[in-house]
UniProtKB/Swiss-Prot annotation:
It comes from Idiomarina loihiensis (strain ATCC BAA-735 / DSM 15497 / L2-TR). Its main location: membrane. It is a peripheral membrane protein. This is ATP synthase subunit beta. InterPro entries: ATP-synt_VA_C, ATP_synth_F1_bsu, ATPase_a/bsu_AS, ATPase_alpha/beta_chains, ATPase_F1/V1/A1_a/bsu_N, ATPase_F1/V1/A1_a/bsu_N_sf, ATPase_F1/V1/A1_a/bsu_nucl-bd, ATPase_F1/V1_b/a_C. One of its GO terms (molecular function) is proton-transporting ATP synthase activity, rotational mechanism. It catalyses: ATP + H2O + 4 H(+)(in) = ADP + phosphate + 5 H(+)(out). The lineage of its organism: Bacteria, Pseudomonadati, Pseudomonadota, Gammaproteobacteria, Alteromonadales. Its EC number is 7.1.2.2. It comes from the Bacteria. Produces ATP from ADP in the presence of a proton gradient across the membrane. The catalytic sites are hosted primarily by the beta subunits. ATP binds at G151, G152, A153, G154, V155, G156, K157, T158. SUPFAM superfamilies: C-terminal domain of alpha and beta subunits of F1 ATP synthase, N-terminal domain of alpha and beta subunits of F1 ATP synthase, P-loop containing nucleoside triphosphate hydrolases. GO terms for cellular component: plasma membrane; proton-transporting ATP synthase complex.
């Protein structure tokens, strides 16, 4: 293949000069062949004319200098796919980083692929039970759907995601792919050991491009994970694809965008924000052969949901789980906001009348409580009508019953985790709404699984 020379380096963006008749194509992978940086991969982004191409480095450019040779591989970045990737940690290029020997893959695939066509796509309305009460009730997940976990810093996106992986891996025994995009290395490490301890590691492929990696890695690692998930789907499986965190994918694009010579747009984001997001999200879809159900953590800068990055992500999702700092500060975990979270599945034709009516009833009572809060703060509970007093009392019980102990948080809380079936969830909330538990103290509903546990707890209070 043709060889070129490095002519300019600005951070993670490198310009190379190739012979005029052998200029690499966009997305071709170039490999550095000398200077102690053998194996460094550069991905072509632009052809600037005159034989010069501009590329993003998939690794640190420390020690790279002008005049160093790089050869064109003639293909885009290829990563290992298939069953051999299960239980392994890989980087953006598919190299193992868990010190457990080579992957030994039977097949490699390009990380750049076209999204499935209209004919290939399928849509079913099957629910995916997660065992987390607030999610199953208020914003149920569809099998083969896309879910976003929205939240600011430190409200529990990663813990919620780990609980979902644990529940789905153990209760549904499917394959999962986890892409760690620009998150803390410590969390990636915890995550690996957590999966190992709960014996689900052999069902998960892990792809990491953490915070300390150059922007090229963080920009492409989501595509690496997605390619592995697509392979499982094309084999006819139902696969889960987890991304933590989709915001860092956008951020990596922002970091290289200006260096690639693009003019920044709103809030300094790249002008290609919507297109970059679309390229990733449109590939996460279910076909007639298999399904990809995706759960994506979305960091919300400064808790502002109108920021261009979370706002662009919203458009692609079937269900949104919004985590709220005010709820977390009350000690209610998972800190899901039942009034802000939505799902397309929340439709009586999909989930049935009983589930729908219960979910609507819960939201109605909580909304009423929210409206009355100001009056209570100024005048106290005594000034409310009997009807409103009852509403407030039920709302506070519901609010506490929406909390639940997590399996992955057992080490911190000391309380054993709970998996609650959808049937039990609906029965519990319906009972509270119907007034069956009006005589029980609200503490009895805090951090329990089913309503039966709340009744038991009330006896000991």
């Amino acid at each position: 293949m043709s060889q070129g020379k490095v002519v300019q380096i600005i951070g993670a963006v490198v310009d190379l000069e190739f012979p005029q008749d052998a200029v690499p194509k966009v997305y071709d992978a170039l490999k550095v062949t000398e200077g102690g940086l053998e194996g460094l991969v550069l991905e072509v982004q632009q052809q600037l004319g005159g034989g010069i191409v501009r590329a993003i480095a998939m690794g640190t450019t420390d020690g790279l200098r002008r005049g160093i040779t790089a050869k064109n591989t003639g293909e885009s970045i290829m990563v290992p796919v298939g069953k051999k990737t299960l239980g392994r940690i890989m980087d953006v290029l598919g190299n193992p980083i868990d010190e457990a020997g080579p992957i030994g893959e039977e097949e490699k695939m390009s990380i750049h692929r076209a999204a499935p066509s209209y004919e290939e796509q399928s849509n079913t309305n099957e629910l995916l039970e997660t065992g987390i009460k607030v999610i199953d009730l208020i914003c149920p997940f569809a099998k083969g759907g896309k879910v976003g976990l929205f939240g600011g810093a430190g409200v529990g996106k990663t813990v919620n995601m780990m609980e979902l992986i644990r529940n789905i891996a153990i209760e549904h025994s499917g394959y999962s792919v986890f892409a760690g995009v620009g998150e803390r290395t410590r969390e990636g490490n915890d995550f690996y050991h957590e999966m190992n301890d709960s014996n689900v590691l052999d069902k998960v492929s892990l792809v990491y491009g953490q915070m300390n990696e150059p922007p090229g890695n963080r920009l492409r690692v989501a595509l690496t994970g997605l390619t592995i998930a697509e392979k499982f789907r094309d084999e006819g499986r139902d696969v889960l694809f987890f991304v933590d965190n989709i915001y860092r994918y956008t951020l990596a694009g922002t970091e290289v965008s200006a260096l690639l010579g693009r003019m920044p747009s709103a809030v300094g984001y790249q002008p290609t924000l919507a297109e970059e997001m679309g390229v990733l999200q449109e590939r996460i879809t279910s076909t007639k052969t298999g399904s990809i159900t995706s759960v994506q953590a979305v960091y919300v800068p400064a808790d502002d949901l109108t920021d261009p990055s979370p706002a662009t992500t919203f458009a692609h999702l079937d269900a949104t789980v919004v985590l709220n700092r005010d709820i977390a500060s009350l000690g209610i975990y998972p800190a899901v906001d039942p009034l802000d979270s939505t799902s397309r599945q929340l439709d009586p034709q999909v989930i049935g009348d009983e589930h729908y009516d219960t979910a609507m009833g819960v939201q109605e009572v909580l909304q009423r409580y929210k409206e009355l809060k100001d009056i209570i703060a100024i005048l106290g509970m005594d000034e409310l009508s009997e009807e409103d007093k009852l509403s407030v009392s039920r709302a506070r019980k519901i609010q506490r019953f929406l909390s639940q102990p997590f399996f992955v948080a057992e080490v911190f809380t000391g309380a054993p985790g709970k998996y609650v079936s959808l049937k039990d969830t609906i029965a519990g909330f319906k009972g509270i709404l119907d007034g069956d538990y009006d005589d029980m103290p609200e503490q009895a509903f805090y951090m329990v699984g089913t309503i039966e546990e709340a009744v038991e707890k009330a006896k000991n209070l």
